[in-house]
């Protein structure tokens, strides 16, 4: 960063990635009872986004989008039938994809992934095959284990593995301790790389169901166990930021906190809230793909600001590579753009468009404040899709809850968005699915 930013050199990068965290689950985003003092402070010292999007509304494609800067359909990490990787899956993030970790490692960064991976659990797809020097965590979701469900299919899964590098070091780890163990591993990595530029990716397992909190947090929130879980995540963020302060790395480290998608609404009190946004996980409504996001970099990102600029997890690859002085891949389409102008000035704007995919199909698109829906569903699973002919249209600045369809009043806006979508589809090349499980024919 230069000019308006004070740090010059190769910064460190930390991505803290919650799992199924709702847009309305943090104190700084308006939750009335969940206490998040560390995230609140992070926002007060940094930049809070009100319109930040993930690349998909479920786990696997969202993670692929974040690490590659590309829509998941371009890498084969999106599928209409099997929407995430399961223990029987044979695929994963292709070796040809370039991750943030690979690009930064190529210019001397130390790299670590600590937490839930969910981009392929066979050796050729693990973090160590995608640019990470170190890995500690579980390779897929914490509910994909016989101990979490009595379902017949789940009972065929192996015990949940906890891995270090490419080795399983435990089976069925105590999930009450996952957040704490990820935090401790993260702190160790940071302290081991005080003199090296580093990239730390911390994809937490929580608050994906089944939810667990450690003894120190269980029963401490008035929101119940879900609140306990979020307050422990907040503690974890505080621990990571504190070690950066203690080591003097805070002024040379760009930290971003966000989520893979918004809340799983059908699991009752075990899930969160999307606040004023409509619906949640698994859908292309705002409540599924707009996520709480805070950027922090003392003395470089101006403190205490809120931006309405559109941001995306896919922006992180070009942003971080640009800040580190690494070349962007020139042999492929990137869907993310550099967010540095917004980090410097919350009034700045970068690419103001969003494509909302469900699986490998485009269900909605946003241009500026306008969002057009072709198809909608009201839940992750269990309901039927609704076709919109003509497409439904919402003005998200005036109607962020997507309650008032104004398509009949805005035919020209529909035409403009359709032209944008047509151009997108014309250039898009979808890769073969990595997620399909042929033996699952039911």
Residue ranges and their predicted role:
Residues 1-392, 400-442:
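Formylglycine-dependent sulfatase
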């Amino acid at each position: 960063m230069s000019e308006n930013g004070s740090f010059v050199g190769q910064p460190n990068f930390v991505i803290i990635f919650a799992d199924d965290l709702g847009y309305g689950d943090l104190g700084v985003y308006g939750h009335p009872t969940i206490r998040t003092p560390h995230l609140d402070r992070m926002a007060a010292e940094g930049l809070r986004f009100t319109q930040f999007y993930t690349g998909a509304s479920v786990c696997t494609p969202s993670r692929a989008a974040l690490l590659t800067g590309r829509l998941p359909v371009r890498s084969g990490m999106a599928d209409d039938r099997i929407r995430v990787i399961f223990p029987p899956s044979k695929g994963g993030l292709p070796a040809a994809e370039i991750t943030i970790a690979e690009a930064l490692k190529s210019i001397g960064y130390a790299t670590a992934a600590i937490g839930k991976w969910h981009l392929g659990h066979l050796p050729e797809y693990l973090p160590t095959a995608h640019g990470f020097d170190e890995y500690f965590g579980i390779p897929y979701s914490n509910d994909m284990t016989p101990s979490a469900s009595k379902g017949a299919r789940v009972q065929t899964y192996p015990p949940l593995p906890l891995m270090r590098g490419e080795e399983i070091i435990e089976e069925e780890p105590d999930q009450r301790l996952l957040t704490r163990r990820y935090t401790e591993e993260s702190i160790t990595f940071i302290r081991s790389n005080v003199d090296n530029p580093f990239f730390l990716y911390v994809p937490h397992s929580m608050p994906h169901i089944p939810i667990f909190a450690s003894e120190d947090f269980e029963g401490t929130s008035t929101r119940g166990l879900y609140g306990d879980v979020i307050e422990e995540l907040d503690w974890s963020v505080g621990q990571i930021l504190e070690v950066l302060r203690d080591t003097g790395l805070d002024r040379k480290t760009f930290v971003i906190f966000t989520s893979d998608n918004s809340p799983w609404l059908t699991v009752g009190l075990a899930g969160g809230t999307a606040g004023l946004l409509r619906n949640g996980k698994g859908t292309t409504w705002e409540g599924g793909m707009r996520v709480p996001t805070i950027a922090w970099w003392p003395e470089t990102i101006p403190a205490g600001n809120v931006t309405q600029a559109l941001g995306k997890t896919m922006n992180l690859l070009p942003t971080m590579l640009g800040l580190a002085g690494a070349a962007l891949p020139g042999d492929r389409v990137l869907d993310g753009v550099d967010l540095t102008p917004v980090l410097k000035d919350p009034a700045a704007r970068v690419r103001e468009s969003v494509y909302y995919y469900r699986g490998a199909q485009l269900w909605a698109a946003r241009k500026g404040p306008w969002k057009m829906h072709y198809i909608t569903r009201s839940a992750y699973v269990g309901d039927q899709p609704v076709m919109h002919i003509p497409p439904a249209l919402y003005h998200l600045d005036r109607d962020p809850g997507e309650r008032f369809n104004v398509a009949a009043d805005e035919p020209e806006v529909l035409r403009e968005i359709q032209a944008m979508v047509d151009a997108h589809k014309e250039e898009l090349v979808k890769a073969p699915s990595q997620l399909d499980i042929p033996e699952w024919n039911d």
